[in-house]
């Protein structure tokens, strides 16, 4: 069985031993399950949202980056109209018949996601076809680093390479993933997760024009100014929070409607203040205030990166985290307000950061559950990992690097 070239693995992962073993395992299982003697290999990373919390779905701006955890796949066309995917660690095979795509046939789970993506690809003018795949991931599931978007971008890369001559853009990838989540999962997600996983590296995104998303890569790494990103899984997963996620864009769009526009990026905070007393939903007002402040902070953060002003950059991330906690209110769910794993872990982290006099922390990604992000001095990384592990377990603490390469066909 063919395997990816070591030079390509070195380029993506910065090493070949661990990654080589992962792809060897992938190849062996793919051959064993599907009887194939050749394969093509693909990778799509998870993502970290650095600043721009819950702004993408209302046309705002985000700085995000792909991370050094990824979903990998061995795949090959099977000459039919049936997609068959085996995911490492899961007993049931994912089977999707391309001749029977409908939400009534695929109602839940990963099969629904794949079916939705195929329908989304077709509706956007792209070809689909049957293939077999064996996939494996080390992206933390249901924790806010976009395990689902990583999987989606892997599948997009597969169908792009096999059936579309690699002509799909990252924007196309994101639309396909968003369609599947919106229509088949009833989740009102934006496109940030998909774009960050697809593009790779640290990136500034502008979501004002959904059909022509603008993005620019940033010359940035936390190590460049002596810090390290640590993702902490707080102990409660994202699996049952679709309503909470959907309420945020819904409430923001309701405010936008009062202001005479469709999305908040089309208006400004002055218009909100002028109409504030007409809006009965106080939380919606607070969330709109977060949007305007957060979009401005993203612009300032990009400027700080450009001028190597990392003190200002960290200050803006700190402000962003406070706004998410106080205005956006996505650190815990009102359905179970006694369980506050996010706020608990933030508070414990703040005690550590105050003691050392450096670093910031914030809720990470969609929120309500899952992970927080702590940005700590490199010299304090081990101390922080040891400290926070007392409360969440060392297996839930992940020092991260930003990976330069996004969703790609490896060879």
Where are these regions (language model features)?
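Phosphate-handling active-site elements
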Residues: 123-132, 159-173, 378-391
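DPxDG-like acidic metal-binding loop motif
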Residues: 66-67, 145-165, 373-376
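Beta-strand segments within the central parallel beta-sheet cores of soluble alpha/beta enzyme folds
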Residues: 84-86, 130-137, 167-181, 314-319, ...
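C-terminal nucleotide
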Residues: 1-47, 72, 76-107, 204-362, ...
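Structural signature of FAD isoalloxazine-binding scaffolds in flavoprotein oxidoreductases
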Residues: 61-79, 199
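Alpha/beta catalytic cores of group-transfer enzymes, especially the acyltransferase/condensing modules
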Residues: 165-213, 320, 346-356, 361-364
């Amino acid at each position: 069985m063919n395997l990816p070239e070591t030079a390509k693995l070195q380029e993506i992962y910065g090493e070949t031993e661990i990654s080589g073993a992962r792809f060897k395992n992938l190849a062996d299982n793919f051959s064993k399950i599907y009887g194939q003697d050749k394969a093509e290999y693909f990778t799509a990373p998870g993502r970290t949202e650095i600043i721009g919390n819950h702004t993408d779905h209302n046309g705002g701006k985000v700085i995000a980056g792909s991370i050094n955890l990824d979903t990998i796949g061995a795949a090959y066309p099977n000459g039919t109209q049936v997609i068959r995917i085996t995911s490492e660690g899961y007993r049931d095979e994912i089977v999707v018949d391309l001749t029977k795509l409908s939400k009534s046939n695929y109602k839940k789970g990963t099969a629904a996601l794949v079916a939705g993506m195929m329908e989304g690809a077709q509706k956007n003018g792209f070809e689909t076809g049957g293939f077999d795949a064996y996939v494996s991931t080390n992206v933390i599931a249901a924790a806010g680093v976009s395990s689902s978007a990583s999987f989606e971008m892997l599948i997009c890369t597969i169908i792009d390479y096999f059936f579309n001559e690699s002509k799909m853009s990252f924007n196309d990838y994101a639309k396909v993933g968003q369609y599947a989540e919106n229509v088949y999962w009833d989740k009102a997600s934006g496109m940030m997760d998909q774009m960050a996983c697809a593009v790779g590296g640290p990136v500034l995104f502008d979501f004002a024009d959904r059909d022509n998303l603008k993005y620019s890569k940033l010359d940035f790494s936390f190590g460049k100014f002596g810090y390290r990103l640590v993702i902490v899984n707080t102990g409660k997963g994202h699996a049952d929070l679709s309503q909470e996620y959907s309420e945020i864009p819904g409430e923001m769009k309701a405010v936008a409607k009062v202001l005479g526009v469709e999305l908040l990026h089309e208006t400004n905070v002055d218009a909100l203040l002028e109409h504030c007393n007409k809006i009965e939903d106080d939380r919606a007002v607070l969330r709109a205030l977060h949007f305007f402040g957060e979009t401005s902070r993203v612009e300032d953060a990009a400027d700080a990166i450009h001028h190597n002003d990392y003190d200002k950059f960290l200050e803006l991330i700190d402000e962003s985290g406070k706004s998410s906690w106080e205005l956006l209110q996505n650190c815990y769910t009102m359905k179970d307000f006694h369980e506050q794993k996010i706020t608990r872990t933030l508070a414990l982290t703040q005690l550590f950061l105050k003691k050392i006099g450096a670093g910031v922390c914030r809720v990470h990604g969609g929120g309500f559950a899952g992970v927080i992000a702590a940005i700590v001095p490199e010299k304090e990384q081990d101390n922080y990992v040891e400290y926070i592990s007392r409360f969440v377990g060392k297996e839930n603490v992940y020092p991260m690097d930003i990976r330069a390469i996004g969703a790609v066909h490896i060879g």
